[in-house]
Protein backbone atom coordinates (compact mmCIF):
# COMPACT_ATOMS: atom_id res chain seq x y z
CA UNK A 1 0.00 0.00 0.00
CA UNK A 2 1.30 3.45 -0.93
CA UNK A 3 2.19 5.64 2.04
CA UNK A 4 2.79 9.30 2.72
CA UNK A 5 6.00 10.39 4.42
CA UNK A 6 4.08 10.89 7.66
CA UNK A 7 2.64 7.39 7.52
CA UNK A 8 6.10 5.91 6.93
CA UNK A 9 7.55 7.77 9.91
CA UNK A 10 4.64 6.89 12.17
CA UNK A 11 4.59 3.20 11.26
CA UNK A 12 8.36 2.87 11.69
CA UNK A 13 8.07 3.95 15.33
CA UNK A 14 5.13 1.86 16.56
CA UNK A 15 6.04 -0.06 19.70
CA UNK A 16 2.56 -1.38 20.43
CA UNK A 17 -0.71 -1.15 18.54
CA UNK A 18 -3.80 -3.05 19.63
CA UNK A 19 -7.51 -2.49 18.93
CA UNK A 20 -9.27 0.24 20.91
CA UNK A 21 -6.02 1.70 22.26
CA UNK A 22 -3.95 4.68 21.17
CA UNK A 23 -0.74 3.36 19.58
CA UNK A 24 2.51 3.65 21.53
CA UNK A 25 5.40 5.24 19.63
CA UNK A 26 9.13 5.11 20.28
CA UNK A 27 10.74 8.55 20.65
CA UNK A 28 14.24 8.98 19.20
CA UNK A 29 15.05 12.43 20.58
CA UNK A 30 13.73 14.42 23.51
CA UNK A 31 14.61 18.10 23.76
CA UNK A 32 14.18 19.89 27.08
CA UNK A 33 14.25 23.51 28.27
CA UNK A 34 13.85 25.23 31.61
CA UNK A 35 10.15 26.14 31.48
CA UNK A 36 8.19 22.93 30.81
CA UNK A 37 10.49 20.37 32.46
CA UNK A 38 10.71 21.02 36.26
CA UNK A 39 7.43 19.30 37.16
CA UNK A 40 8.31 16.34 34.92
CA UNK A 41 11.59 15.76 36.74
CA UNK A 42 9.80 16.16 40.08
CA UNK A 43 7.41 13.43 38.98
CA UNK A 44 10.28 11.06 38.25
CA UNK A 45 11.85 11.85 41.60
CA UNK A 46 8.60 11.27 43.49
CA UNK A 47 8.07 7.89 41.81
CA UNK A 48 11.72 6.85 42.12
CA UNK A 49 12.19 6.49 38.37
CA UNK A 50 15.36 7.19 36.36
CA UNK A 51 15.47 8.77 32.91
CA UNK A 52 15.14 5.68 30.71
CA UNK A 53 17.64 6.74 28.02
CA UNK A 54 19.46 9.89 29.12
CA UNK A 55 21.69 9.83 26.04
CA UNK A 56 18.67 10.60 23.86
CA UNK A 57 17.63 13.68 25.83
CA UNK A 58 19.29 17.08 25.37
CA UNK A 59 18.60 20.25 27.35
CA UNK A 60 19.27 23.95 27.02
CA UNK A 61 18.22 27.26 28.54
CA UNK A 62 16.44 29.63 26.19
CA UNK A 63 13.03 31.02 27.20
CA UNK A 64 14.02 32.90 30.36
CA UNK A 65 17.60 33.88 29.59
CA UNK A 66 18.81 37.45 29.36
CA UNK A 67 20.14 38.49 25.96
CA UNK A 68 22.33 41.20 27.51
CA UNK A 69 24.31 39.23 30.10
CA UNK A 70 25.15 35.65 31.10
CA UNK A 71 24.07 36.43 34.67
CA UNK A 72 21.48 33.85 35.74
CA UNK A 73 19.86 36.45 38.02
CA UNK A 74 19.22 38.99 35.27
CA UNK A 75 15.61 38.08 34.47
CA UNK A 76 14.24 37.75 37.99
CA UNK A 77 13.67 35.08 40.62
CA UNK A 78 11.35 32.81 38.64
CA UNK A 79 13.74 32.65 35.69
CA UNK A 80 16.69 31.99 38.00
CA UNK A 81 14.85 29.22 39.84
CA UNK A 82 13.80 27.50 36.62
CA UNK A 83 17.35 27.58 35.25
CA UNK A 84 18.83 26.36 38.53
CA UNK A 85 16.29 23.53 38.61
CA UNK A 86 17.27 22.53 35.07
CA UNK A 87 20.95 22.40 36.04
CA UNK A 88 20.14 20.31 39.10
CA UNK A 89 17.86 17.94 37.20
CA UNK A 90 20.25 17.39 34.30
CA UNK A 91 23.14 16.69 36.69
CA UNK A 92 21.05 14.27 38.76
CA UNK A 93 19.56 12.36 35.83
CA UNK A 94 22.63 12.37 33.55
CA UNK A 95 21.31 14.58 30.76
CA UNK A 96 23.47 16.71 28.46
CA UNK A 97 22.84 20.39 29.20
CA UNK A 98 23.90 23.39 27.15
CA UNK A 99 23.74 25.96 29.94
CA UNK A 100 24.27 29.72 29.83
CA UNK A 101 28.04 29.39 29.63
CA UNK A 102 28.18 26.57 27.08
CA UNK A 103 29.28 27.60 23.57
CA UNK A 104 26.35 25.67 22.03
CA UNK A 105 23.65 27.29 24.23
CA UNK A 106 20.74 28.74 22.34
CA UNK A 107 17.13 28.26 21.32
CA UNK A 108 16.28 24.57 21.52
CA UNK A 109 14.94 24.44 17.95
CA UNK A 110 18.08 26.07 16.60
CA UNK A 111 20.68 24.00 18.43
CA UNK A 112 19.05 20.61 17.70
CA UNK A 113 19.56 20.80 13.93
CA UNK A 114 22.89 22.63 13.99
CA UNK A 115 24.44 20.00 16.27
CA UNK A 116 23.04 17.08 14.29
CA UNK A 117 20.89 16.03 17.24
CA UNK A 118 18.00 16.27 14.79
CA UNK A 119 18.25 13.69 12.00
CA UNK A 120 15.90 12.59 9.20
CA UNK A 121 13.54 9.76 10.02
CA UNK A 122 13.44 10.42 13.76
CA UNK A 123 10.58 11.06 16.12
CA UNK A 124 11.39 14.19 18.11
CA UNK A 125 9.45 15.77 20.96
CA UNK A 126 9.86 18.77 23.22
CA UNK A 127 7.68 20.58 25.72
CA UNK A 128 7.32 23.43 23.25
CA UNK A 129 4.75 23.98 20.50
CA UNK A 130 7.31 24.93 17.86
CA UNK A 131 8.98 21.52 17.91
CA UNK A 132 7.47 21.17 14.44
CA UNK A 133 10.60 23.04 13.25
CA UNK A 134 12.54 19.77 13.10
CA UNK A 135 10.14 18.37 10.52
CA UNK A 136 12.20 20.29 7.97
CA UNK A 137 14.58 17.31 8.07
CA UNK A 138 11.93 14.70 7.38
CA UNK A 139 11.51 13.87 11.05
CA UNK A 140 8.19 13.55 12.86
CA UNK A 141 8.48 16.33 15.44
CA UNK A 142 5.80 17.80 17.66
CA UNK A 143 5.26 19.61 20.93
CA UNK A 144 4.09 17.85 24.09
CA UNK A 145 2.77 18.81 27.53
CA UNK A 146 4.60 18.50 30.84
CA UNK A 147 2.94 15.19 31.80
CA UNK A 148 4.04 13.80 28.44
CA UNK A 149 7.56 15.14 29.05
CA UNK A 150 7.64 12.97 32.19
CA UNK A 151 6.33 9.96 30.25
CA UNK A 152 9.05 10.26 27.60
CA UNK A 153 11.76 10.75 30.22
CA UNK A 154 10.57 7.61 32.01
CA UNK A 155 9.95 5.33 29.03
CA UNK A 156 11.27 6.88 25.78
CA UNK A 157 7.78 6.27 24.40
CA UNK A 158 4.56 8.21 23.97
CA UNK A 159 0.97 7.35 23.09
CA UNK A 160 0.04 9.18 19.94
CA UNK A 161 -3.05 8.86 17.76
CA UNK A 162 -2.73 8.88 13.99
CA UNK A 163 -3.27 12.28 12.40
CA UNK A 164 -4.92 13.11 9.10
CA UNK A 165 -2.60 13.98 6.22
CA UNK A 166 -2.43 17.24 4.29
CA UNK A 167 -0.24 18.04 1.31
CA UNK A 168 0.57 21.69 0.69
CA UNK A 169 2.18 22.12 -2.71
CA UNK A 170 3.79 25.45 -3.54
CA UNK A 171 4.15 25.39 -7.30
CA UNK A 172 6.59 27.40 -9.39
CA UNK A 173 9.27 29.87 -8.35
CA UNK A 174 8.93 32.72 -5.87
CA UNK A 175 9.73 36.26 -6.94
CA UNK A 176 12.59 38.46 -5.82
CA UNK A 177 12.84 39.16 -2.07
CA UNK A 178 10.31 36.45 -1.20
CA UNK A 179 11.42 34.23 1.68
CA UNK A 180 10.23 31.12 3.48
CA UNK A 181 8.54 33.40 6.02
CA UNK A 182 6.48 34.99 3.27
CA UNK A 183 5.60 31.56 1.88
CA UNK A 184 4.38 30.20 5.19
CA UNK A 185 2.46 33.35 6.12
CA UNK A 186 0.77 33.25 2.71
CA UNK A 187 -0.12 29.60 3.32
CA UNK A 188 -1.60 30.37 6.74
CA UNK A 189 -3.45 33.31 5.23
CA UNK A 190 -5.08 30.87 2.83
CA UNK A 191 -5.81 28.02 5.26
CA UNK A 192 -6.57 30.16 8.30
CA UNK A 193 -5.06 29.70 11.74
CA UNK A 194 -7.09 26.51 12.32
CA UNK A 195 -7.00 25.08 8.80
CA UNK A 196 -4.49 22.39 9.71
CA UNK A 197 -6.15 21.22 12.92
CA UNK A 198 -5.93 17.43 13.19
CA UNK A 199 -3.42 17.15 10.37
CA UNK A 200 0.26 16.54 9.84
CA UNK A 201 1.21 18.77 6.92
CA UNK A 202 3.74 17.87 4.24
CA UNK A 203 5.14 20.83 2.31
CA UNK A 204 6.29 20.11 -1.23
CA UNK A 205 6.60 21.61 -4.68
CA UNK A 206 9.30 23.40 -6.63
CA UNK A 207 9.36 26.46 -4.37
CA UNK A 208 9.85 24.27 -1.28
CA UNK A 209 12.59 22.17 -2.88
CA UNK A 210 14.45 25.41 -3.68
CA UNK A 211 14.55 26.47 -0.02
CA UNK A 212 17.66 26.12 2.12
CA UNK A 213 17.42 24.10 5.33
CA UNK A 214 17.07 27.37 7.24
CA UNK A 215 14.10 28.25 5.05
CA UNK A 216 12.52 24.84 5.50
CA UNK A 217 12.90 25.19 9.26
CA UNK A 218 11.06 28.52 9.13
CA UNK A 219 8.30 26.84 7.13
CA UNK A 220 7.84 23.85 9.45
CA UNK A 221 8.24 26.02 12.55
CA UNK A 222 4.97 27.75 11.70
CA UNK A 223 2.99 24.64 10.78
CA UNK A 224 1.57 24.81 14.29
CA UNK A 225 0.26 28.32 13.49
CA UNK A 226 -2.20 26.82 11.03
CA UNK A 227 -3.27 24.36 13.72
CA UNK A 228 -1.26 21.38 12.41
CA UNK A 229 0.27 18.75 14.69
CA UNK A 230 3.51 18.79 12.72
CA UNK A 231 5.06 19.92 9.45
CA UNK A 232 7.26 17.86 7.15
CA UNK A 233 9.60 18.33 4.21
CA UNK A 234 11.07 15.21 2.61
CA UNK A 235 14.86 15.02 2.98
CA UNK A 236 16.97 15.48 -0.14
CA UNK A 237 20.51 16.45 -1.15
CA UNK A 238 20.05 19.87 0.46
CA UNK A 239 19.30 18.07 3.73
CA UNK A 240 22.23 15.67 3.46
CA UNK A 241 24.69 18.46 2.67
CA UNK A 242 23.51 20.40 5.72
CA UNK A 243 23.75 17.38 8.03
CA UNK A 244 27.14 16.04 6.97
CA UNK A 245 29.91 16.49 9.53
CA UNK A 246 27.76 17.86 12.33
CA UNK A 247 28.59 16.78 15.86
CA UNK A 248 25.94 14.09 16.29
CA UNK A 249 25.55 13.15 12.61
CA UNK A 250 26.63 9.63 11.63
CA UNK A 251 30.23 9.31 10.43
CA UNK A 252 32.03 7.12 7.88
CA UNK A 253 30.21 3.97 6.81
CA UNK A 254 27.33 4.80 9.15
CA UNK A 255 26.82 8.04 7.24
CA UNK A 256 26.47 6.18 3.93
CA UNK A 257 24.00 3.76 5.49
CA UNK A 258 22.02 6.62 6.99
CA UNK A 259 21.78 8.52 3.71
CA UNK A 260 20.65 5.37 1.90
CA UNK A 261 17.79 5.07 4.41
CA UNK A 262 17.00 8.78 4.40
CA UNK A 263 16.52 8.66 0.63
CA UNK A 264 13.52 6.36 1.19
CA UNK A 265 11.82 8.99 3.36
CA UNK A 266 9.44 10.46 0.83
CA UNK A 267 5.80 10.01 0.00
CA UNK A 268 5.05 7.34 -2.56
CA UNK A 269 3.91 8.77 -5.92
CA UNK A 270 0.40 7.33 -5.55
CA UNK A 271 0.03 8.05 -1.82
CA UNK A 272 -3.36 9.43 -0.84
CA UNK A 273 -3.80 12.55 1.33
CA UNK A 274 -6.90 13.57 3.24
CA UNK A 275 -6.55 17.15 2.01
CA UNK A 276 -4.48 18.87 -0.69
CA UNK A 277 -3.79 22.61 -0.83
CA UNK A 278 -2.01 24.26 -3.76
CA UNK A 279 -0.39 27.69 -3.88
CA UNK A 280 1.16 29.50 -6.84
CA UNK A 281 4.56 30.75 -5.67
CA UNK A 282 4.63 33.54 -8.24
CA UNK A 283 1.60 35.14 -6.58
CA UNK A 284 3.28 35.45 -3.15
CA UNK A 285 4.30 38.98 -2.13
CA UNK A 286 6.09 40.11 1.05
CA UNK A 287 3.68 39.38 3.90
CA UNK A 288 2.77 41.34 7.05
CA UNK A 289 0.22 40.34 9.68
CA UNK A 290 -2.34 43.00 10.61
CA UNK A 291 -4.27 41.17 13.34
CA UNK A 292 -3.81 38.97 16.38
CA UNK A 293 -3.31 35.56 14.82
CA UNK A 294 -0.94 34.59 11.99
CA UNK A 295 -3.84 33.95 9.63
CA UNK A 296 -4.76 37.64 9.74
CA UNK A 297 -2.15 38.55 7.17
CA UNK A 298 -1.93 40.51 3.92
CA UNK A 299 0.60 41.25 1.22
CA UNK A 300 2.47 44.50 1.82
CA UNK A 301 0.76 46.11 -1.20
CA UNK A 302 -2.75 45.23 -0.02
CA UNK A 303 -5.06 47.14 2.29
CA UNK A 304 -6.26 45.96 5.70
CA UNK A 305 -9.58 44.15 5.18
CA UNK A 306 -12.85 45.39 6.62
CA UNK A 307 -14.57 43.03 9.07
CA UNK A 308 -17.66 43.09 6.83
CA UNK A 309 -15.62 41.39 4.10
CA UNK A 310 -15.59 38.16 6.12
CA UNK A 311 -18.67 36.02 5.49
CA UNK A 312 -18.05 33.83 8.54
CA UNK A 313 -19.46 35.56 11.66
CA UNK A 314 -16.67 34.19 13.87
CA UNK A 315 -13.99 35.54 11.53
CA UNK A 316 -15.85 38.86 11.31
CA UNK A 317 -15.94 39.22 15.09
CA UNK A 318 -12.29 38.18 15.34
CA UNK A 319 -11.32 40.84 12.79
CA UNK A 320 -13.23 43.54 14.67
CA UNK A 321 -11.54 42.60 17.93
CA UNK A 322 -8.11 42.39 16.30
CA UNK A 323 -8.40 45.80 14.65
CA UNK A 324 -9.41 47.36 17.95
CA UNK A 325 -6.49 45.76 19.80
CA UNK A 326 -4.00 46.65 17.07
CA UNK A 327 -5.43 50.20 16.77
CA UNK A 328 -5.76 49.90 13.01
CA UNK A 329 -8.43 50.96 10.53
CA UNK A 330 -9.67 48.88 7.61
CA UNK A 331 -8.76 50.14 4.15
CA UNK A 332 -5.32 51.51 5.02
CA UNK A 333 -1.99 50.06 3.95
CA UNK A 334 0.52 48.83 6.51
CA UNK A 335 3.16 50.93 4.75
CA UNK A 336 1.43 53.89 6.42
CA UNK A 337 1.80 52.42 9.91
CA UNK A 338 4.68 53.58 12.10
CA UNK A 339 6.50 51.13 14.37
CA UNK A 340 8.26 51.50 17.71
CA UNK A 341 10.39 48.37 17.92
CA UNK A 342 11.91 45.72 15.70
CA UNK A 343 12.80 42.19 16.79
CA UNK A 344 14.95 39.98 14.58
CA UNK A 345 15.30 36.54 16.16
CA UNK A 346 13.26 33.58 17.56
CA UNK A 347 13.19 29.90 16.61
CA UNK A 348 11.54 31.01 13.36
CA UNK A 349 14.17 33.42 12.04
CA UNK A 350 17.41 33.59 14.07
CA UNK A 351 19.70 31.43 11.96
CA UNK A 352 22.70 32.64 9.99
CA UNK A 353 20.78 32.95 6.71
CA UNK A 354 18.17 35.13 8.45
CA UNK A 355 20.82 37.43 9.92
CA UNK A 356 22.58 37.74 6.56
CA UNK A 357 19.31 38.78 4.92
CA UNK A 358 18.64 41.42 7.57
CA UNK A 359 22.23 42.70 7.48
CA UNK A 360 22.08 43.07 3.70
CA UNK A 361 19.17 45.48 4.13
CA UNK A 362 20.68 47.30 7.12
CA UNK A 363 24.15 47.86 5.66
CA UNK A 364 24.89 51.51 5.02
CA UNK A 365 21.69 52.74 6.66
CA UNK A 366 20.59 53.89 10.11
CA UNK A 367 17.71 52.82 12.31
CA UNK A 368 14.98 55.46 12.15
CA UNK A 369 14.75 57.94 15.05
CA UNK A 370 12.53 56.69 17.85
CA UNK A 371 12.82 53.02 16.84
CA UNK A 372 14.57 50.41 18.99
CA UNK A 373 15.79 47.44 16.95
CA UNK A 374 17.36 44.32 18.43
CA UNK A 375 19.01 41.36 16.72
CA UNK A 376 19.20 38.12 18.71
CA UNK A 377 21.13 35.18 17.22
CA UNK A 378 19.55 31.79 17.82
CA UNK A 379 22.59 30.11 19.35
CA UNK A 380 26.21 30.49 20.33
CA UNK A 381 27.41 29.01 17.01
CA UNK A 382 25.12 31.36 15.03
CA UNK A 383 26.46 34.30 17.03
CA UNK A 384 30.06 33.21 16.41
CA UNK A 385 29.47 32.72 12.67
CA UNK A 386 27.73 36.08 12.34
CA UNK A 387 30.56 37.84 14.16
CA UNK A 388 33.15 36.05 12.01
CA UNK A 389 31.34 37.44 8.95
CA UNK A 390 31.15 40.93 10.45
CA UNK A 391 27.37 40.98 10.58
CA UNK A 392 27.40 42.24 14.16
CA UNK A 393 29.37 45.30 13.07
CA UNK A 394 26.92 46.00 10.24
CA UNK A 395 24.01 45.91 12.67
CA UNK A 396 25.74 47.98 15.35
CA UNK A 397 26.86 50.64 12.86
CA UNK A 398 23.28 50.88 11.62
CA UNK A 399 21.98 51.40 15.16
CA UNK A 400 20.67 47.91 15.90
CA UNK A 401 21.41 46.27 19.25
CA UNK A 402 23.44 43.04 18.91
CA UNK A 403 22.40 40.63 21.65
CA UNK A 404 23.25 37.22 23.15
CA UNK A 405 21.33 34.04 22.16
CA UNK A 406 17.88 33.33 23.58
CA UNK A 407 14.16 33.36 22.85
CA UNK A 408 14.13 37.08 23.70
CA UNK A 409 11.18 39.19 22.56
CA UNK A 410 9.29 36.31 20.96
CA UNK A 411 7.48 35.94 24.26
CA UNK A 412 7.23 38.04 27.41
CA UNK A 413 9.15 35.66 29.69
CA UNK A 414 12.39 37.63 29.98
CA UNK A 415 13.49 41.26 29.98
CA UNK A 416 12.92 41.80 26.25
CA UNK A 417 9.29 42.84 25.88
CA UNK A 418 6.96 45.48 24.53
CA UNK A 419 5.31 48.14 26.64
CA UNK A 420 1.55 48.71 26.34
CA UNK A 421 0.69 50.28 22.99
CA UNK A 422 4.10 49.70 21.41
CA UNK A 423 4.07 48.34 17.87
CA UNK A 424 6.71 45.82 16.77
CA UNK A 425 7.88 44.40 13.46
CA UNK A 426 8.87 40.90 14.53
CA UNK A 427 10.39 37.86 12.83
CA UNK A 428 8.82 35.56 15.43
CA UNK A 429 5.87 33.22 14.95
CA UNK A 430 2.97 34.50 17.06
CA UNK A 431 1.15 37.82 17.10
CA UNK A 432 -1.38 36.98 19.82
CA UNK A 433 -2.58 39.67 22.20
CA UNK A 434 0.14 40.29 24.79
CA UNK A 435 2.52 37.73 23.29
CA UNK A 436 5.46 40.16 23.33
CA UNK A 437 4.28 42.04 26.40
CA UNK A 438 0.98 43.18 27.86
CA UNK A 439 -0.74 45.54 25.41
CA UNK A 440 2.02 45.11 22.81
CA UNK A 441 1.11 45.00 19.11
CA UNK A 442 2.98 42.48 16.97
CA UNK A 443 3.33 42.36 13.18
CA UNK A 444 4.99 39.20 11.82
CA UNK A 445 7.40 39.66 8.93
CA UNK A 446 10.56 38.23 7.36
CA UNK A 447 14.03 39.32 8.57
CA UNK A 448 14.54 41.54 5.52
CA UNK A 449 11.14 43.19 6.00
CA UNK A 450 11.90 43.74 9.69
CA UNK A 451 15.27 45.35 8.94
CA UNK A 452 13.69 47.61 6.32
CA UNK A 453 10.99 48.65 8.79
CA UNK A 454 13.67 49.54 11.34
CA UNK A 455 15.43 51.78 8.84
CA UNK A 456 12.28 53.52 7.64
CA UNK A 457 10.28 53.63 10.86
CA UNK A 458 7.40 51.92 9.05
CA UNK A 459 6.81 48.94 6.79
CA UNK A 460 7.94 49.13 3.18
CA UNK A 461 7.80 46.86 0.15
CA UNK A 462 11.39 45.59 -0.04
CA UNK A 463 10.90 44.71 -3.70
CA UNK A 464 11.28 48.45 -4.28
CA UNK A 465 14.60 49.36 -2.61
CA UNK A 466 14.23 53.03 -3.50
CA UNK A 467 11.84 53.25 -0.56
CA UNK A 468 14.69 52.65 1.88
CA UNK A 469 15.67 55.95 3.46
UniProtKB/Swiss-Prot annotation:
UniProt-recorded name of the protein: 3-isopropylmalate dehydratase large subunit
Organism: Photorhabdus laumondii subsp. laumondii (strain DSM 15139 / CIP 105565 / TT01) (Photorhabdus luminescens subsp. laumondii)
Pfam family, one: Aconitase
Cofactor requirement: [4Fe-4S] cluster
GO biological process, alphabetically ordered: L-leucine biosynthetic process
Top-level taxonomic group: Bacteria
CDD domains xrefs: IPMI
Cofactor binding summary note: Binds 1 [4Fe-4S] cluster per subunit.
Taxonomic lineage of the native organism: Bacteria, Pseudomonadati, Pseudomonadota, Gammaproteobacteria, Enterobacterales
Gene Ontology terms for molecular function: 3-isopropylmalate dehydratase activity; 4 iron, 4 sulfur cluster binding; metal ion binding
Pathways per UniProt: Amino-acid biosynthesis; L-leucine biosynthesis; L-leucine from 3-methyl-2-oxobutanoate: step 2/4
Entry keyword annotation includes Lyase: yes
Family named by the database record: Belongs to the aconitase/IPM isomerase family. LeuC type 1 subfamily.
